[in-house]
Each structure stands twice: as structure tokens, then as C-alpha cells.
């Protein structure tokens, strides 16, 4: 499957999918399925999780998990809301989706407040624009787009804040490969070195 990563990135980088398909088929369907099937903890951690489940220490809920605060925490799956669990402690152990509007990063927050950066949006015909969660950048150069959607000449962003334009931005480079993220870093460095200040 990893052999498909670069062709998929090519499709994304060259905007070869209609925005509606990009939203529903890629970001909302394929990406979660890919994450579930091909990205995850090592086998040993899964075995440890299964042991905790079998011991009754850990319970996995179904989709659309909801947490409410009554006298204690109450959690349940919206699809199976007849089974509810109560606890005095709650541990959140999921990786949230990328969302620049919800970032806790003080630098990104300040750039957002100062309107130097803004969220990337997909324009979908007959729909409200879809915010991908990424910072608006030029997908080819990774230059940050200003309020007028023109790239800043020397302001770049790559990696996790661009997830929603690029894909698998948190993936680590594997030895012996021409890793996408290292190519992007090289491209940005070369652009900066050739820029006249």
C-alpha cells in the first residue's frame, strides 16, 4: 500500500479530483479507512490493549462517541446509546483531526489572530465552502497564502498544519526511500536560498 502514497499525493497536489469527491470520498472516507487499516500502534500495544479489554479495564465504544457531564462523566456511542458508561475520571486518548482554528500552538494562534494565515477551504459547487483544517498554502510551493490568497514570498508552512491539503503529513521518513516530507523540506530550503531579500 505504501507504494500508492506518492501517486495519491500527485493527485492531491495537482488538484485532479473534484472538490466534492475530495471532501467526501478522500478526506471523509478513504483517509479514516486508511488510518484504521494501515496506520496504528505496534502489534505488542494492540495485544496489551486486548488484554486490558479482556480484564474489563478498558471498554471501546462504538462510532460517534459522546461525553456528557452528569454527576460524573457519562459516555456512550450515539449509534448504541442504550449502553452508557459512568466514571469519575476521563482519559482522552485519540489524536484529534487537524484544525487550525482549534490549535493550541501560540505562534499559529497569533498568526491566525493577526490574519497572516487563514484556514484552507475547498470551494464546492452549491455548498458552503468546506474547511479542511489546514493552513491555506500554495500546494506546490508550501508558501502561506495571505488574506488575498496570494503567496507570501518568504513565509512557508509544511507538515501537520497542512494536513487537509497534503496527506499523511505526520508520517516519518523511511530509510532508503525518497521521502515526500524530506523532498518538501529540501524544496522550501532551496526556494529560500534562491530568494533575494
What annotation goes with each model-predicted range?
Residues 1-196:
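Flavin (primarily FAD) cofactor-binding/catalytic cores of flavoenzymes
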Amino acid at each position: 500500500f505504501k507504494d500508492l502514497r506518492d501517486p495519491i499525493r500527485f493527485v492531491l497536489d495537482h488538484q485532479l479530483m473534484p472538490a466534492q469527491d475530495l471532501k467526501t470520498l478522500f478526506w471523509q472516507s478513504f483517509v479514516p479507512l486508511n488510518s484504521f487499516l494501515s496506520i496504528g500502534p505496534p502489534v505488542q500495544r494492540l495485544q496489551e490493549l486486548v488484554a486490558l479489554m479482556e480484564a474489563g479495564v478498558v471498554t471501546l465504544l462504538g462510532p460517534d462517541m459522546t461525553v456528557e457531564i452528569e454527576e460524573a462523566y457519562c459516555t456512550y456511542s450515539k449509534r448504541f446509546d442504550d449502553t452508557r458508561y459512568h466514571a469519575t475520571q476521563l482519559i482522552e486518548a485519540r489524536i484529534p483531526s487537524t484544525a487550525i482554528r482549534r490549535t493550541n500552538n501560540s505562534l499559529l494562534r497569533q498568526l491566525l489572530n493577526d490574519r497572516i494565515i487563514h484556514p484552507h477551504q475547498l470551494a464546492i459547487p452549491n455548498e458552503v465552502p468546506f474547511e479542511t483544517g489546514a493552513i491555506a498554502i500554495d500546494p506546490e510551493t508550501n508558501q502561506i497564502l495571505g488574506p488575498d490568497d496570494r503567496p507570501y514570498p518568504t513565509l512557508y508552512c509544511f507538515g501537520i498544519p497542512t494536513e487537509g491539503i497534503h496527506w499523511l503529513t505526520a508520517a516519518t521518513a523511511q530509510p532508503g526511500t525518497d521521502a515526500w516530507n524530506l523532498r518538501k523540506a529540501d524544496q522550501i530550503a532551496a526556494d529560500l536560498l534562491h530568494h533575494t531579500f
